[in-house]
Regions:
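Conserved short alpha-helical segments that host acidic/polar catalytic motifs at enzyme active sites
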Residues: 1-209, 215, 220-228
């Protein structure tokens, strides 16, 4: 009751492959991001080596750190949208891309080729909190559980429905996103499920608000030129 925010992240973390220490605790807060992550990143070394070429150093003994740097690099430095971030780190399979409309195929192939070293493999579910909002994402095979619910102007994201019911016993529209399908919540704009937008939900600032932002919609210059 003493704190106010439009978005909250929390995690009861049990580290299995890394030391349990305060530097790797969750929510992992760094570079204006707050990340909670359930899973194991098998592509960690590939992702880490790529990020080190751009000055990011992974020193905190948690694979969540490299996720944070990837988000910062793509969102802040490359000016991708969170939707595009999701299409990089949980990129659709090539066979899935082949079934998309031509323009979308071109964009997804471009992102996969240019940022191939930032594909995150292994089982994971992630909630990324940043200024103005939240993005939740599963690995593309959905090897970790993640559910979403809503009540009035609030959105709840958790590994299990039971956790949502603790916060909001009468939560509605409980939904399990597909693997690789981003769930993005924009403050005062609404909720975005993959390619489905629910404009009835406008997240308001209040003492127990949950929700978020999904960026400014900008494309990096090279992507704008290729995809006007």
């Amino acid at each position: 009751e003493d704190y106010e925010a439009y978005s909250w992240t929390a995690h009861g973390r049990y580290p299995t492959n890394t030391p349990g220490w305060w530097g790797g605790a969750h929510p992992f807060a760094l570079l204006q991001y707050s990340i909670v992550h359930n899973g194991e990143i098998s592509s960690y070394d590939t992702n880490r080596r790529f990020m080190e070429m751009f000055g990011y150093k992974c020193t905190l003994q948690t694979d969540t750190e490299v996720i944070t740097y990837i988000a910062d690099y793509l969102l802040r430095r490359q000016k991708l949208t969170p939707e595009e971030l999701a299409s990089v780190i949980a990129a659709p399979f090539w066979s899935t891309i082949d079934r998309k409309p031509p323009r979308e195929q071109e964009k997804l192939r471009y992102l996969r080729k240019v940022f191939s070293s930032l594909l995150i493999t292994g089982p994971f579910s992630i909630v990324l909190g940043f200024e103005g909002g939240l993005m939740a994402l599963n690995d593309r095979l959905k090897l970790r559980s993640m559910v979403v619910g809503e009540k009035d102007d609030k959105v709840y994201i958790a590994s299990e429905e039971a956790a949502i019911r603790v916060m909001a016993p009468d939560a509605e529209n409980i939904y399990a996103p597909a693997g690789g399908e981003p769930v993005i919540v924009r403050v005062k704009e609404g909720k975005f499920y993959g390619n489905r937008f629910f404009d009835h939900l406008a997240v308001q600032r209040d003492k127990a608000g949950h929700g978020g932002r999904a960026g400014d919609g900008a494309h990096p210059a090279h992507l704008r030129e290729k995809l006007p």
